């Protein structure tokens, strides 16, 4: 069964928080989209799915580079076949 790692781009606080506009924060949108995508993929029964953030307040890494490195290392350690990184703009 293919393994799909879904990276909900950005952190909720501190550094690497993403874009903001129209009353929305990128990290909140990517978190919600990632959770919904994971639900749909799991429901199909055809994929194993892992999310980069399991709670909306989870912060990964301690710098921009550290955050990205942690996400990639987690996906590779898990043996992901696919890495989907979610981002938004406007």
Where are these regions (language model features)?
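Catalytic-core regions of hydrolytic enzymes
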Residues: 2-90
